[in-house]
């Protein structure tokens, strides 16, 4: 396994999200906000129960239950998930996951 994101355990989400990172000045806290445009978890042929967002890689699993769906004209349009990091160690672990996920999906990293 390299790295994958799931909303239902066992089912990888193929849609690659837009990810925005913020970090406190002292480096103790951070937030990663993921936005998925028309994810398969919402618009696929078989809709699944979304139980959270699970970030899986060779080191294990990171998870958040803070997942919100966006609807436009009554139709599912996207998912937003927020992952909180409360220590420099959690930040480093998250960044290792993102490095693996970026490599697996041909993504790059840009600083704002």
From Swiss-Prot:
Q: Name one GO biological process term.
A: photosynthesis
Q: Where in the cell is it found?
A: Cellular thylakoid membrane
Record Pfam families: Psb28
What UniProt keywords apply to this chain's record, in alphabetical order? Membrane, Photosynthesis, Photosystem II, Thylakoid
Question: Which cellular components does GO assign to this protein?
Answer: photosystem II oxygen evolving complex; plasma membrane-derived thylakoid membrane
Question: Topology relative to the membrane, per the entry?
Answer: Peripheral membrane protein
* Disulfide bond sites: none
Q: Which InterPro entries match?
A: Psb28_c1_sf, PSII_Psb28_class-1
This protein's major location comes to membrane
Q: How does it assemble?
A: Part of the photosystem II complex.
| The family this protein is said to belong to | Belongs to the Psb28 family.
The record's listing under HAMAP family reads:
PSII_Psb28
Q: What is this protein called?
A: Photosystem II reaction center Psb28 protein
What species does this protein belong to? Answer: Synechococcus elongatus (strain ATCC 33912 / PCC 7942 / FACHB-805)
Q: Taxonomically, what lineage is the organism? A: Bacteria, Bacillati, Cyanobacteriota, Cyanophyceae, Synechococcales
